Amino acid sequence: MKITTPHGTLEGDNIEAILKEHGFDCLRGADLSDADLRGADLRDANLRDANLSHANHVKLSIAKISILPNEGDIIGWKKAWTDNEMPPTPVIVKLLIPADAQRSNATGRKCRASTARVLDLQDKQGNSLPPDTTAYSGYDTDFTYKKGETIHVEDFDTNRWKECAPGIHFFITRIEAVEY
């Protein structure tokens, strides 16, 4: 198998052998168009900017790394911060991602949504904070989280492979948000 990347051509018996020899980032920007991905284990592979058009078994490979359900509401968790003290205190935000929200995850565990309802603000131990608590995004301090409010991101990026693109970032397990 040969794979063309921005850094040259990689060769190996199969895609797993190439990943083993060159590392998980070797596929970044790779041309995988028309590739046979049957049975390929792409967990942890960096496919950012990779061309997967017409690749064999792409839908199955994507399904294996997709962690979000395609339908129904889901609960998401994210870490945010209070700013009423220094250093800021971490806050765990419990979100309801509605069924009609745009949602995405790339190849990792971090997810994004276009809209969410703030169900609760908690300390790291899981205790609910007072209802008037405001939490702030660690990325954009103008983006706030208040219990009961519905929040939106107008410029949600629909490209699922852009993990850190615009969106409400969250995890599907609480412990991942706590440890982030």
Please provide the spans of the model-predicted regions.
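Intrinsic low-complexity/IDR segments
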Residues: 1-34, 38, 43, 48-180
